Swiss-Prot record:
Organism: Adelaide River virus
Coiled-coil residues: none
Family: Belongs to the ephemerovirus glycoprotein family.
Keywords on record: Glycoprotein, Membrane, Signal, Transmembrane, Transmembrane helix
Extracellular side: 25-581
Sites where a glycan is attached: 87, 375, 465, 472, 478, 506, 529, 551, 562
Keyword match Nucleotide-binding: no
Protein name: Non-structural glycoprotein
CC per GO annotation: membrane
Amino acid sequence: MDFLRQCTLIQVMILAITIRLTHGGWTNFPESCVQLQPENAYDEMCDDSSLTNSNSIEYHNKLKSTKKFCILNQIKSVKTNLYRCYNISITSVCNSELSSQNLHQDYEVNPISRRDCLKHIIKNWNDENLERSLIQKSEDIYRTRCNFLKNTETKIEDYIIYQEKTESSVINADGLDSMIETKLIELESNKKLDNTVKTCISWEQGGDSRFNTLNLIALDLNLCLAKNSYKLEKCLLCYFFIGQDKWYRGEDGFMISIELSELDTKSIPKCEILWYRLYPGNLLTINQDYLAKKVQERNRGCNAVKSILRSGKAPPLENMIKYTIPLQAGYGIGFREKIEKTVYSAPLRGNLVERRNYDFFRCHYFPSKIKIVENKTHTPPINLCVYHFGKGSCHYPDNKYFISMNPVSFEENQHYPKSGQSFDYQSGLNGIRKKIKNQEYYIPDSFLMTLIYSSHTKSILEKTNITEVFRNDSNYENHTLQDYLGLFNKEDEGMRPERDLINLPNITSETEDDDTSDLNLELNKNLINKTSSGFSNDNSNVINIPSKEYNKTDIKTVGKINKTSIIINHEEKDYWHEEYNMWGLSGLSFLLLLALFYNKIKRKIKRKS
C-alpha cells in the first residue's frame, strides 16, 4: 500500500508540474492599450507580415546549411531617413517705452557633432515623436512674453533634432550616419553552397519563388528585433552579421548605425549586448511544415473573422480568441468582450435581450510568460505575474483586467497536442481558464508562440561567441569581426553620406486674431563657410511671410554652413503679457480720476479763499 501511495503521490506531483508548465507557456501580452473605433481596428487586424509568417517558418531549416550571410549592398532605390541635430540659441530683447514697444529675437542655429547628436537621440528615444521640431517649439516655449515699461533680455539654449527623408541609389554598409528602414534580406539557399558569399536581393525584388522562402530576420535574428521594439527597455544594442552596431526603434521600422568609437555603451542605461554567430547552428527541433500549416490556418481564420466583423455581426468569442490575437511583437489589435443588454418592448410584455459585442484596442504586445501567483501584499491576493521576453523579473500589469474576461472554458491540457493525434481546434491562440479563491483569470496561452519562443530563448541568450563576419565583397572573406570593426576607425569620407546640408524652417508667430496683419520677418542669415583660406560671409534677402499662409512645408535649404542667425522683428503685439492691457487701461483710468479729483480739490480751495 505504501508503494501504491508513493506512486500516486508521484503522479499527482507530475500532474501539478504539467499544469504549472502550462501556465508558463508563451503568449503575446498586451500593455498600454488605447481604445479604437472598430473600423480603424479592422484595418490593422490580421497582419500577415508577422514574425511567424509561413515563409519564415516553412523554410527556416534551410538556414542550417547556410554558412554565410550577406548584406544588401546595392539596390536601385531606397528611402533613407537621416536625423541631424542642431544647437539653438534664442536671444530675445524687449524694448518697451511709452511711445513704442518692440520685440527683437535672434536665433542662432549650429550643427551638433554626430557624437552629441547620438546622445540627444538616446535621450529622446522613447518619445512618440523623436523629431524635436523647431517649428512646433517656436509656438510655445520659444515665445517670449514682454512686460510693460520693462526692457529685458532673455536667452534660451536648446537643441533640435531634424529629420531629412532622402532617396538614395546605394546603401553602403559603412554609412554610419544613415538611419535605414529595416529591409527583409534573403539569400538563395537551394543551391550548393561554397566559401563564397551568395547574392543578396530585397524582399520586393524576389520574383523567383526560391527567393521568397527564406527570411534571414525570422525567428533567431528576429528575436533581437523583437526585444528592441519594447518600450520598457531604454535601448538595446545588437552586433549584427554585418559587423555594425544597430540601434532599433522597432515601432518605426528603422535603425541607426553608429561607430563603436563614437559612443561608450556603458553610458547608455539598461543596455546589454548580444553577440550573434554568423552560423546559427541547430535552430528548430519542431516540424517545420506542421508549424507553417498552423500559421496559415490562423491567418485564414483571422481574415474570415474580420469579414464577419465588417458585416456588422459578432463572431463567437472562441473564434476571436483563436484567430485574432496578434502573433507579432510590437503594436497590434486586441479586443475585450462586452455584453449589451437592450429591452424589447411589445404591447403587453417586454423582454430583456442580450447581445455580444467587442471593444477594440491598439496595444503594445510583448512575447511573455504568464503565471498565476499568490501575493498577499496585493488586493486581491491572487494576481498575474508577467515575464516579458528579455526582462528578468516579473511585474504585475496595470491592465490585468484586459484579459480577465469570461472566455470559453477549455480543458487545461487541451491546447497541447498529444502524441500521434491530429491538432485542429487549438491551432491558433487559445487559452485556459483557471479559478482560484473566487478569482477567475484567463491565461491566453499561445500554442504557436510557445513552440517558437521556448525553442529559441535559451539558445539565443547563450550565443556569446564572436565569429567571422563578412561584407559583400570577396576581399573581406577572411576577416574577423574585430578586423571588420577596425575599418570604422579609418577615415574614408567616400563611404559616408553628405552631412553638409541643413534644413531650417521659417520662424513665425501666430495669434488667435483672424485680422492679424502679416508678419514682417527679417531673415538675416550669416552664412559662415569654413574654407582653406579662412571664413567668408553671405547675406540673404529680407523675406515677408504671411502668418496665415505659413505651414510646415515652408522650409529653406541653406548650403554648407557652420552658423545661421535668424533675426525676427515682431510688429504685432501678441507677445505682450495679458497684464499689460489690463494694467494699461486701469492705469490710465486711475490717472484720469486722480486728475479730476485734484482739479475738484483745487476749485474748493479757491472758493474758500
